[in-house]
Design a protein with these regions (language model features):
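ATP-dependent adenylation/nucleotidyltransferase module used to activate substrates
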Residues: 1-167, 187-188, 267
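AMP-forming adenylation/ATP pyrophosphatase catalytic core
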Residues: 136-142, 151-381
Length: 381
């Protein structure tokens, strides 16, 4: 398979003989297929399962007992070493607390992005990963060399592509990362796993935010922040049409869970100081759309999109593709740095729904192949 050949070339290009490879094994089919691919290429990676565990208040992670059983079976099948690493305290401090703090500010968090940046490729590397030449994962992403610079790049399967969840990592991190399954479709991964008789070959994909486990998201928010009843106001008329339990339960663009009749209704704005949710009615209300995004900072993984294009001045407007949420579609737009406002400005060619401050705008080249990085949205209109 082409992607498997790419992984071999990537390792050989490093010039490291007999490289030490760590695999972040979750117990799912993707990371299990990673182990199979590396083993068939002649490598003997060490498997690591990152355990989050349960905190004092009863918040628990995903079905870790089943996960560990799967990883143990995988390690036994290939006679590979396995280590279980507990990063519960670090996960709570860096990811869960970030989520709570972000929601409390009235912003929309991205815990998956922070988990990759701070835990999987951050704390793990500081504790264990630094001893290894490469860290391999089952993410649907690839890496590409352009003029001898390594870039994070998209997977050929747009539905499964996960570069948007990786867009806050840095160059040091991407240099160590291997994505052996990144160039395959999910169907191809399943076929590979079935042929290799992997224990997780038919296991269902995990869904949702991992640290919540079986806890409903709103239940998690309520346990963390409590409730604070407030008004729901129709933006166009200024009339109070309902009540909510707290602005932190709602995000821009939200349709479900408002408890309003005569809809559909969409959240178009939040007044944090007054604890008011503003909504508009209709299947496609214009108030839920915008074409302009502002970001205070831009995290460039390898090089900035301007450097990639050979442009020295970031105030020069350049054409890019971008995403503001995890979808298969890319949006065309222009990006520039506004020196007067100290803001990066992203202007979309078409109106986009639900621009939520706190979320991240992920920036790609116009062919949506290279993922340059991302910036947190501070304003959308």
């Amino acid at each position: 398979m082409k992607n498997i050949e790419h992984i071999q070339k990537r390792i050989l290009k490093s010039g490291i003989k007999n490289p030490k490879i760590a695999v972040l094994a979750s117990g799912g089919v993707d990371s299990s297929a990673v182990v199979s691919i590396l083993y068939d290429l002649g490598y003997r990676p060490t498997l690591f399962y990152i355990q989050i565990g349960m905190d004092k208040d009863g918040f628990e992670d995903c079905s870790w007992e089943d996960d560990i059983t799967m990883v143990q079976m995988l390690a036994k099948k290939y006679n590979l070493p396995l280590e279980i690493i507990s990063l519960h305290d670090e996960y709570w401090e860096h990811v869960v607390q970030y989520t709570i703090d972000t929601v409390k500010q009235g912003l929309t968090p991205n815990p998956d992005m922070m988990c990759n940046k701070l835990i999987k490729f951050g704390v793990f590397n500081e504790k264990v990963g630094y001893q290894y030449d490469f860290i391999a994962t089952g993410h649907y992403a690839t890496t590409t060399y352009v003029n001898d610079v390594l870039y994070l790049s998209t997977a050929p399967d747009p539905v499964k592509d996960q570069t948007d969840f990786l867009a806050q990592i840095n160059f040091t991190q991407v240099q160590k990362l291997l994505f052996p399954t990144g160039g395959l479709t999910k169907t191809e991964v399943r076929e590979l796993a079935t042929k290799a008789q992997l224990p997780s070959a038919q296991r269902k994909d995990s869904q949702g935010i991992c640290f919540l486990g079986k806890i409903n998201y709103n239940e998690f928010i309520e346990r963390a922040l409590g409730t604070k009843p407030g008004r729901i106001i129709e933006k166009e008329t200024g009339k109070t049409i309902g009540t909510h339990k707290g602005y932190w339960f709602h995000t821009i663009g939200q349709r479900k869970g408002l408890g309003l009749s005569g809809g559909p209704w969409f959240v178009v704005k939040k007044d944090i100081k007054r604890n008011i949710i503003l909504v508009s009615r209709g299947y496609d209300p214009q108030d839920q759309y915008g074409q302009h995004i502002q970001m205070a900072e831009l995290n460039n993984i390898s090089q900035s999109p301007w450097a990639y294009l050979g442009i020295n001045d970031e105030t020069t407007s350049i054409e890019v593709c971008f995403k503001i949420r995890h979808t298969p579609e890319f949006t065309r737009g222009s990006l520039r740095y506004n020196a007067e406002k100290s803001r990066y400005e992203l202007d979309s060619q078409t109106p986009i729904q639900g621009i939520a401050p706190g979320q991240y705008a992920v920036i790609y080249d116009i062919d949506h192949n290279i993922c340059f990085g991302s910036g947190m949205i501070i304003k959308g209109y």
